[in-house]
Amino acid sequence: MDCKVVSLNEKDQFIPKIKSSDPVITGLFQYDAAQQISFEKRMSKENNGREAALANVIREYMNDLKLSSEQELNIQHLANGSKVVIGGQQAGLFGGPLYTFHKIFSIITLSKELTDTHKQQVVPVFWIAGEDHDFDEVNHTFVYNENHGSLHKVKYHTMEMPETTVSRYYPDKAELKQTLKTMFIHMKETVHTQGLLEICDRIIDQYDSWTDMFKALLHETFKAYGVLFIDAQFEPLRKMEAPMFKKILKKHQLLDDAFRATQKRTQNQGLKAMIQTDTNVHLFLHDENMRQLVSYDGKHFRLNKTDKKYIKEEIINIAENQPELFSNNVVTRPLMEEWLFNTVAFIGGPSEIKYWAELKDVFELFDVEMPIVMPRLRITYLNDRIEKLLSKYNIPLEKVLVDGVEGERSKFIREQASDQFIEKVEGMIEQQRRLYQDLLDEVAGNQNNINLVNKNNEIHIQQYDYLLKRYLLNIERENDISMKQFREIQETLHPMGGLQERIWNPLQILNDFGTDVFKPSTYPPLSYTFDHIIIKP
């Protein structure tokens, strides 16, 4: 597999500004992610003393998996005080978008580089956001149908949308297998298809909860790298979090004030507010099989779906004795994660690292230091066919990744059209505009006639526009094969107006290039970069 790094002319300059140590951006974080001194400081930080307990919890969480020797060793390293590189993601259908895998590769890559540079073991940890309850965000994925040259949405359907956390959701296995079958119908059959389908079927048969199936697929892919997995909703982990839940409940107003103040500061720097929430407690409570947002009304802590209410002593008692009923929101999850782990760096997507920028004062309030916040690696897969099509139409890869192919497609259509025809139509439009102005001069002062001339001109211009558009449409139809090839490029490299990794599913890559494609024996060794990586399987 070939691998190269390209620099894109990105529309969003947030990550390039992190790369260049822009003082406005770095001032929003505890550490400058582009400076080596930041890593030296984090590597030398004193541990929090929770590493042995965490190692036991992670071992318990992963005990339904057959651990690799690399994972066994990393659990020991964690128990002995090794620091971590960490990142997380929602449990998406069949692994979710490709960037989930790329986030894990980012964690693996950075932890290895830190281990090699500092001669200290750094452990890669992936945090599964099983506490989330927005099932609409994880119940679907997309598949590229090569025969049609188009993307198709594949969705796992439920009779009723679950309101509990995804870790507490147990999908209908027959329906899930039907969803899997639908996905494979759209994918081309390769020598890898049957083996991949058997792996997915086995996971569905062997595991019951939504997040356990997700975990099993990730484990199958990344176990050889020694990646450790933990679900935010895992009950033994929640028991570890009880002291922090109590602190959050006791300081909820100060927490909310700190968050709002930091968010306002980021907005004053010209950034858009990322975190949208009305709560002033920033926790959820599981009640009546629903994940319910907690808010404080001045006297009571209230739940948003059943309107149950608790005085402070009651809700703190729940945190003490039943911490598994609590879960974090977007504000408290990073805080809890860093309170638990001895983290060198957190790896996040472009939006994630922006919302971490709104939390600096929250970390300081709880005397928890924000780690180095790093953007994940961004990766695109380029197959031989698409590379040949780019060459055929002389389209720069970097341009497609940023802008798509619409501009190049329109340019191609104009090149196939008759210049004389287009010039004559455009000349007729210009002639009409001159005639229109002459007629307006003739009827000046007579509003009825002015309206008549305006309407007549509008009809003529519309007809000329229609003539030109239909002519170019006919050119498109005459070049149907080329139009299909432009669609192929678009749906592969810039689907739905964005990067491939945001839409495509990992199963597509596994089906095309083999079930070992992401394994260390096949996948190219990566180096951490702020730029874009192109991989040719």
Swiss-Prot record:
EC numbers, comma separated: 6.-.-.-
Residue stretches in coiled coil: 422-450
Keyword Coiled coil belongs to the record: yes
Residues making up the signal peptide according to the UniProt record: none
Keywords: Coiled coil, Ligase
Intrachain disulfide bonds: none
GO MF terms held by the record: ligase activity
Pfam families cross-referenced by the UniProt entry: CC_BshC, Rossmann-like_BshC
Role played: Involved in bacillithiol (BSH) biosynthesis. May catalyze the last step of the pathway, the addition of cysteine to glucosamine malate (GlcN-Mal) to generate BSH.
Protein family per UniProt: Belongs to the BshC family.
NCBIfam families, sorted: thiol_BshC
Name of the protein: Putative cysteine ligase BshC
Gene expressing this chain: bshC
